[in-house]
Amino acid sequence: MFCAFCKSFTLNTFCKICSQILSEPSPIVRELEGFKIYSFYGYSEIKELIHSKHQMHGYFIYKNLAKFAFKKFAKSFSFPDQIYALPIDDRVRFGYSHTAILANTLRAKNLKPIFHALHATSKISYSGRDLQFRQNNPRNFKILKKITAPIILVDDIVTTGTTILEAKNTLEKAGIKVLFALVLADAKH
């Protein structure tokens, strides 16, 4: 086997050196329309890893990235009341849901994931599409469960922010408080 990041020989998903590098992310904050989106890596740093979600080995890559970034966040996060980590459109594709993998590591006192609660009714792919296309083709999110606590939105990447903002607006229209979003990578970096 080879390290998914540097391609050196290893029996694990990442070699020891890359595991150490990836387990020390540099958080970035982007604000869109007054809404904060926290990312752990610049897109340019982990582009190949992000695109692995379209293959079966992406499951192992996402599990490790979630452990390196999201789990570490969950350990340091505290909030006095119950909060849900809500993966955006956590439908199973390619054998797993990459957003569900990320949200699953967000477990701590008063923080737990809620699955299959917000799905897009549109099947259009945004991959490689520009802002105009994204604005003209909304996801049309549907809330599938009763949500009784504030939400942290979870996704793998923020590009233009249209998906995250549309998810936020859908939830807020239903009276659900959305605190912020967590993503692995920000495409602006």
Predicted regions and their residues:
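Charged helix-capping and loop-helix junction motifs
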Residues: 69, 97-104
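Glycine-rich phosphate-binding loops at beta-strand->alpha-helix junctions
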Residues: 87-99
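Active-site-facing substrate-recognition patch
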Residues: 16-82, 92-93, 117-148, 182-189
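Short, well-ordered alpha-helices that flank and scaffold nucleotide-derived cofactor binding pockets
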Residues: 71, 75, 104-108, 169, ...
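Short cysteine-rich clusters marking metal-coordination/redox-active sites
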Residues: 3-6, 15-18
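A phosphate-binding catalytic loop at a beta-strand-loop-alpha-helix junction
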Residues: 153-167
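Cys/His-rich microdomains that often coordinate metals
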Residues: 10-11, 22
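PRPP-dependent phosphoribosyltransferase catalytic core
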Residues: 165-189
